[in-house]
Amino acid sequence: MFLFTNGKVLWGAVIAAFILSIVFYPFLPTQMPIHYDVANSPDLTVNKLAGTVMLPVLMVVFAWARKINWQFVFAVYILLICHIVVLCLAL
């Protein structure tokens, strides 16, 4: 339960997502694939800047919303995992 009750760990995860975006940014293609079809070929792409900033910004929103409902903490960690997967698949 430490991950869910400690605000420092939560904001550390948000900061880690932004750091990952900054580190991976020069290595990413101009268009990042964010969805794949059944044949494992990308069928939806976004701009590199949008792809690296979109999920960390959502993490900030959910981290602030945890004051309203503690279940938003789960969303922050799930978005961190999704962000890591998207960055790795885009390389």
From Swiss-Prot:
Induction: Expression controlled by a sigma-Y-regulated promoter which needs the sigma-Y factor for the binding of the RNA polymerase and subsequent transcription. It comes from the Bacteria. GO terms for cellular component: plasma membrane. Keywords: Cell membrane, Membrane, Transmembrane, Transmembrane helix. It is found in: Cell membrane. It is a multi-pass membrane protein. The chain crosses the membrane at residues 9-29, 44-64, 71-91. The keyword Membrane applies. The keyword Calcium does not apply. This is Uncharacterized membrane protein YbgB. It comes from Bacillus subtilis (strain 168). The gene is ybgB.
